[in-house]
Amino acid sequence: MKVAAGIEDPQPLFDPSRPPFGHALFTDAVISAIEGGRVAHGWLLTGPQGVGKSAMACMAAAWMLRETEGQTSFVETTGMVVDPDDPGSNLVCKGHHPDLLVIRPEIKDNKSGQIKLDQIRKLVGFLGHKPGRGGWRVAIIDSMDQVNRNGANALLKLLEEPPEHTLLFLIASRPGRLPPTVRSRCRVVRIPALDGENCKTIVANAMPEESEGRISDLARLSEGAPGRALSLAASQSDDLYRTACALLTEPRLDEGALAALCE
């Protein structure tokens, strides 16, 4: 998905009624940098897949592109004061803000699943223009794991000579595969796995009709990564887990049932 003026069919980035939380280290770092005038134009968000890196980057974009001050916060513990009814933040949530570009692998005609070099080149042009609403221009690449070396090299010039009032959030689950020159020009913030309770809360908010038992199983199996928990739920992998546990705790192992489960 790409979000920018003129891009077709933008999709909502996140639901402000169910905002991400639990990563105050990142949100506090962004706030401190902006308020202290020490803004790193490139931010590299690392951590396990599904832990919420993209969601936190989108939330930071909503905060950066807000148009009024003094609103109530999405989540009290994050310190990021934004209101989903703020004009700028609302456009970010809906995926329509002209000063936000989100780059993800294209779905059509993209067997490799990679972010294409042309997408990175469009990013260069996007950040080179003045903000449409007079504030910042923000871009999110989700994720750098799908950017090849040519794309990373094209991105490097942006990181070396960033235009004024631009922020670039790079998402990476495998940052060690990135060129050292890219990593060295970014402020690196690790987004760790959530604790069990925070993970359960996020999964429960996303699946309000599910039982508490299933929510607990999904949170435990995901190891603190809510995105992974939702993927497990979609594939019904947690059902296999519960069936296997039930078989293995029987006084006598039902080898036939176990063999059927493994098929």
Show where each model-derived region lies.
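Flexible beta-alpha connector loops of hexameric P-loop NTPases
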Residues: 108-117, 144, 188
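Conserved catalytic/switch belt of AAA+ P-loop NTPases
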Residues: 128, 153-167
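Charged, glycine-rich active-site and insertion segments that engage polyanionic ligands
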Residues: 1-63, 68-85, 90-91, 164-166, ...
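Loop/turn-to-beta-strand initiation segments
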Residues: 134-138, 163-169
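Conserved Walker B
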Residues: 143-147, 175
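Conserved D-loop-proximal element of ABC-family nucleotide-binding domains
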Residues: 148-150, 180
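A short hydrophobic beta-strand->loop->alpha-helix junction that borders the nucleotide-binding pocket
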Residues: 46, 102-107
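Conserved alpha-helical scaffold flanking the Walker A/P-loop in AAA+ ATPase domains
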Residues: 29-33, 88-90, 114-138, 146, ...
